[in-house]
């Protein structure tokens, strides 16, 4: 963003000068690690610039609130300035509720106050599809408790203006921003098309549900899109996948990705049974509702910190596939085969709709969003198996991304402003200075060394090649569920044993889940059967036959990888590290997994230090500061001594 943002910054007090936000932060303080969060936010306030509001500037705050993956995004004059999930602050995965801390950080990052916002957009509109909702209630009745919960959630959404004012410490009357309720799937569509590189595109949004819709098909032209079709409640590919995910013993919100990994171990021998659950009906699809419970009302909690969803499958599904697996119990061949069949059915239905969308638009460009668009296996089949030539997937394809979409819906669709922004990276979160990194290391009682770039990249590439586990913390944090080289744990992909070591010492996750490669973009065609850019780790490609044995740690059981292609112009530091590794090993890729252990991806240097100290990583890199532990420290010291180089 241009310097106009800093020039238009207000006084510090205009953002944080009241008791209301600090009362909210006091609530966070009662959470684990809340003290450090408060320290970080207080420190951020001190850094705010001063000045007056730039009257020519148009500032739009987008919110995903009262739903899983609560998030905020700030768009100023058509440019995405900041976007971040609430979970990164609260340290609660998929944090629901109102994203007060995420919104406050976005404003702080831009140096503006809540009173200077022109528009606030929330990716929910309880009025959307009102006629369909009423007709459904008349025909089916409604579970009283379920209906009460949905009405309460709708009331919270409608009251977002006063909630935001209270959270940010101003009177509602002082909030001059116009409030926009953007239909959930229109926000998804906007999040994909308006930030894509395409002037014209077909757009598909697929998830569980939002505003009574589970799928939206649209056509984007310039600075607007038109809705072509939609699938309404109770039919939903996302709900189908989540229901079977629950049956497979993964009941927590957001565990569908585990099933995608498990599916590769099974045989889709139950595919014909799955076709009884999902019927490809003409252009779209429908569910056989006797296998599901959500039509009758399922308890869902969105207003607290942790989102929850009640049981979505019916007794009929249990009769078909047997008793559901208990969480953390043994996974059998039956479970693997059901997972494989579930994934195959999802892919068939997904591609069926994609092909139909091409027939209706005949546009070569496709944009994808919605939680189902996080299914990288299905995405990887789109270009080879449909007529589309080009593809853009919103990096935060799940509901967090609707914060971005809601803001751009206002800028482009509502205000009619021309498009000027392309989301070619997802590094939109907080960044920290070298001094802050050093302070975090010192406050933990650790010894760190600051290296210049040449020494840093050479040493870390060498340590990775020698089998060390490296925590890599650089620049602005990623937005969305994937670590893309700024909040990552990196290891050598050539070592088959490193997966088990990584799980035992750091990640502690299920052994069937694959680890992903980050590869130099220019080397993709040499190592994988497809080479279309995959910057957000949302495409699965087959590994070339001659390369599989060389990178066993990132070659899944079905000879695939969910890869991130790394371009020098997008992330030069990450690209350089991988390039140094290639010089040492001849392999232009590293294993990249998210920098966390059973919690959200680390945001601050303090989070990174804490994860480093409670796990068994070998090296922590915060900017140019290196912390070595145990054997890694001894090996580094011996290398320095043998080279005759004095340690600073």
What are these regions (language model features)?
Residues 27, 38-40:
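Intrinsic low-complexity, disordered N-terminal segments enriched in polar/charged/small residues
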Residues 114-125, 179, 362-370:
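Short glycine-rich phosphate-binding loop at a beta-alpha junction
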Residues 57-60:
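Extreme N-terminal starter segment of soluble prokaryotic enzymes
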Residues 66-85, 90-93, 136, 143-146, ...:
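Flexible beta->alpha loop and helix N-cap segments adjacent to enzyme active/binding sites
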Residues 88-112, 350:
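N-terminal phosphate-binding loop and adjacent alpha-helix
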Residues 327-353:
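Adenine-nucleotide phosphate-binding core of ATP-dependent small-molecule kinases
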């Amino acid at each position: 963003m241009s310097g106009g943002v800093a020039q238009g910054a207000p006084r510090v007090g205009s953002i944080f000068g009241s008791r209301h936000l600090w009362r909210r932060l006091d609530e966070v303080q009662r959470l684990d690690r809340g003290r450090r969060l408060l320290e970080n936010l207080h420190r951020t306030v001190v850094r705010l610039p001063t000045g007056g509001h730039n009257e020519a500037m148009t500032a739009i705050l987008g919110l995903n609130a009262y739903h899983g993956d609560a998030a905020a995004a700030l768009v100023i004059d058509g440019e995405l300035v900041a976007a971040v999930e609430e979970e990164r602050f609260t340290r609660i995965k998929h944090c629901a509720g109102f994203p007060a801390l995420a919104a406050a950080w976005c404003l702080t990052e831009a140096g503006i106050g809540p009173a200077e916002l022109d528009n606030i957009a929330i990716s929910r509109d309880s009025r959307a599809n009102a006629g369909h909702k009423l007709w459904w209630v008349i025909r089916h009745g409604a579970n009283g408790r379920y209906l009460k919960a949905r009405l309460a959630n709708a009331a919270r959404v409608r009251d977002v203006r006063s909630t935001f004012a209270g959270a940010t410490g101003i009177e509602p009357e002082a909030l001059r921003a116009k409030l926009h309720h953007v239909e959930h799937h229109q926000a998804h569509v906007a999040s994909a098309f308006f930030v894509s590189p395409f002037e014209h595109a077909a757009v598909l949004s697929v998830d569980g549900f939002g505003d009574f819709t589970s799928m939206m098909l649209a056509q984007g032209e310039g600075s607007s899109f038109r809705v072509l079709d939609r699938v309404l409640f109770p039919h939903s590919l996302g709900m189908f996948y989540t229901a079977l995910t629950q049956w497979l013993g993964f009941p927590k919100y957001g565990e569908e990705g585990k099933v995608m990994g498990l599916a590769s171990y099974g045989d889709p021998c139950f595919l014909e049974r799955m076709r009884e659950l999902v019927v490809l009906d003409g252009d779209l699809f429908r569910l056989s509702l006797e296998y599901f419970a959500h039509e009758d009302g399922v308890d869902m909690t969105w207003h607290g910190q942790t989102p929850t969803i009640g049981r979505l499958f019916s007794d009929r599904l249990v009769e078909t596939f047997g008793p559901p697996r208990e969480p953390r119990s043994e996974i059998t061949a039956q479970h693997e085969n059901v997972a494989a069949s579930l994934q195959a059915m999802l892919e068939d239905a997904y591609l069926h709709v994609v092909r139909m969308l091409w027939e209706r638009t005949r546009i070569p460009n496709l944009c994808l969003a919605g939680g189902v668009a996080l299914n990288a296996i299905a995405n990887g089949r789109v270009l080879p198996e449909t007529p589309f030539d080009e593809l853009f997937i919103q990096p935060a394809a799940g509901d967090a991304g609707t914060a971005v979409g809601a803001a751009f819906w206002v800028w482009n669709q509502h205000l009619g402003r021309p498009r000027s922004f392309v989301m070619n990276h997802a590094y939109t979160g907080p960044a920290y200075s070298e001094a802050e990194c050093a302070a975090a290391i010192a406050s933990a009682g650790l010894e760190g060394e600051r290296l210049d770039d040449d020494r840093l990249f050479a040493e870390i590439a060498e340590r990775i090649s020698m089998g060390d586990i490296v925590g890599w913390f650089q620049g602005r944090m990623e937005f969305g569920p994937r670590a893309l080289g700024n909040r990552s744990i990196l290891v050598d992909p050539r070592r088959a044993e490193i997966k088990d070591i990584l799980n035992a010492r750091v990640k502690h996750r299920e052994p069937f889940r694959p680890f992903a490669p980050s590869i130099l973009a220019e080397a993709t065609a040499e190592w994988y059967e497809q080479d279309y850019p995959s910057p957000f780790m949302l495409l699965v490609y087959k590994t070339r036959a001659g390369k599989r044995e060389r990178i066993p740690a990132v070659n899944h059981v079905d000879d695939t990888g969910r890869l991130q292609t790394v371009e020098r112009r997008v992330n030069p530091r990450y690209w350089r590290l991988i390039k140094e590794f290639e010089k040492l090993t001849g392999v232009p890729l590293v294993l990249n997994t998210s920098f966390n252990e059973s919690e959200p991806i680390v945001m601050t240097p303090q989070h990174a230090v804490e994860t480093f100290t409670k796990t068994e990583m070998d090296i922590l890199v915060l900017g140019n500061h290196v912390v070595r532990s145990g054997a890694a420290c001894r090996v580094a010291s011996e290398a320095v001594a043998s080279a005759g180089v004095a340690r600073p």
